């Protein structure tokens, strides 16, 4: 395992490109907002599909600070304060784990990614319903209508939130495994990392 290396400008470029890739994946998944049932699956599916972008950052930069930057930039794209705070806190944990375990330690990176995804899901999807319920419900009513809102009210609860956060953690773990295999099979063999 290589030690972390010093900051380089190309690290910023790589990190920014991976944030862009991650956000493009999320935007493609936004079609899942068509139903309240599928809306709940956006973050878990993103935790699997977007993992490769997250794992490419330390693989290419070998710098734990770039993990934090990835999480911060991801949060800023959300334009929602609870999401921003949650992603930054998750990023700090992920960066600290990478500094302690090593920037290329897959177990440490996977745990950090799981923490980041759970906090991002909590801050972005569940905080609005748990703490700003009236505002969120009115906003969804305007965007999607009464029928959508009725279904949403039936399925969103504190228990649903806990279950979904566990599902997000499991999906982030799966995303970590898939990313590790992709990195080894395609990126290492081709000499990209």
At which residue positions do the language-model features occur?
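Short, charged juxtamembrane terminal tails flanking transmembrane helices
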Residues: 1-9, 183-193
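Hydrophobic transmembrane alpha-helices
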Residues: 2-68
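Hydrophobic alpha-helical transmembrane segments
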Residues: 12-17, 44, 64, 68-69, ...
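Short helix-perturbing small/polar motifs within transmembrane alpha-helices
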Residues: 17-19, 24, 88-125, 176
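Alpha-helical transmembrane segments of multipass membrane proteins
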Residues: 18-26, 30, 50-54, 78, ...
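Membrane-interfacial segments
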Residues: 29, 33, 37, 61, ...
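Interfacial aromatic-anchored transmembrane helix boundaries in multi-pass membrane proteins
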Residues: 30-35, 39, 72-96
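Membrane-embedded alpha-helical hairpins and interfacial helices in multi-pass inner-membrane proteins
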Residues: 111-187
